[in-house]
Amino acid sequence: MTITANKRHYLEKVSHQGIISALAFDQRGALKQMMAAHQEGEATVTQIETLKVLVSEELTPYASSILLDPEYGLLATKVRANQTGLLLAYEKTGYDATTTSRLPDCLVEWSVKRLKAAGADAIKFLLYYDVDGDEQINLQKQAYIERIGSECTAEDIPFFLELLSYDERISDNNSAAYAKLKPHKVNGAMSVFSDKRFGVDVLKVEVPVNMAYVEGFTEGEVHYSQAEAIKAFQDQEAASHLPYIYLSAGVSAKLFQETLYFAAAAGAQFSGVLCGRATWAGSVPVYITKGEDEARKWLCTEGFQNIDELNRVLEETASPWTEKI
């Protein structure tokens, strides 16, 4: 694929030598739930904004870029390390759990133009997609992504599309029932949104198997042999010509690192990660129960260790996006 000089410039700002080692902290609903588990009452705006600032201050020196949201993360954008690029999220958090459609929705007071003016080097939008889902729902979702792609083209800024697969008939994505479908769901969605009419520059995707069911990665029930898991990663590489990066999906830092080694050995030429909770999740209970200073200490020690180890893994496993663009 080819991109404009401006888009290439911005992609270089969010990566290091073609590898995207990005820190994801655009969580809103999930972060509120994590905080609420350690205190009485809901998390306050100040609590959320402050933790985002702490993470940005302490960990962005070791990340090629950080993904934040404009609802609670604008203060954090101001304190990131000078060389660290910025992705801003464009979607509202969560989805309507009373329906299976999971239709996308933008932050209504924002546009790509405004996110760019706020300092974004790239735009990220999250889409829930069931490749086998209701045809009319999927047509709506495709049209929605076309609009965002057109906005990003008009502003000449990279479009990162985050795809989260699901099945309209299965409520638990961690279930064995969904694990059997996951390779098809993940790779099928990637194939759909690689069409150039969507204007996507980089895909942010799940690994195509649930590693908790892979032979050699679990002491419980196995739903993928090693060979089947390898095939899923190979099919993922074949599903798109676009650069793609992995999300950590809330798994532990150790499992995520092991997964990246497995993916690379299988032939997946991913160009980095947007890693969130696997890096910073442990700071949340410390921040809520012990305060800012202790949270900062955690980020400087365990948080740094998580991101430093991940960077070392990426050096050995990731392929530069420049090989595809």
From Swiss-Prot:
Entry-linked SMART domains = DeoC
Which superkingdom, per the lineage? Bacteria
Stored SUPFAM superfamilies: Aldolase
The residue range of the signal peptide is none
Enzymatic class: lyase
Which biological process, per GO, is one annotated for this protein? Answer: D-tagatose 6-phosphate catabolic process
Q: Which reaction does it catalyse?
A: D-tagatofuranose 1,6-bisphosphate = D-glyceraldehyde 3-phosphate + dihydroxyacetone phosphate
Q: What is its EC number?
A: 4.1.2.40
Pathway, according to UniProt? Carbohydrate metabolism; D-tagatose 6-phosphate degradation; D-glyceraldehyde 3-phosphate and glycerone phosphate from D-tagatose 6-phosphate: step 2/2
- Which GO molecular function entries does the Swiss-Prot or TrEMBL record give? 6-deoxy-6-sulfofructose-1-phosphate aldolase activity; tagatose-6-phosphate kinase activity; tagatose-bisphosphate aldolase activity
A Pfam family this protein belongs to?
DeoC
Which keywords appear in this protein's UniProt record, sorted alphabetically? Answer: Lactose metabolism, Lyase
PANTHER family named among the record's database cross-references: SULFOFRUCTOSEPHOSPHATE ALDOLASE
Q: Which family does it belong to?
A: Belongs to the aldolase LacD family.
Name this polypeptide is given: Tagatose 1,6-diphosphate aldolase 1
Source organism (scientific name):
Streptococcus pyogenes serotype M1
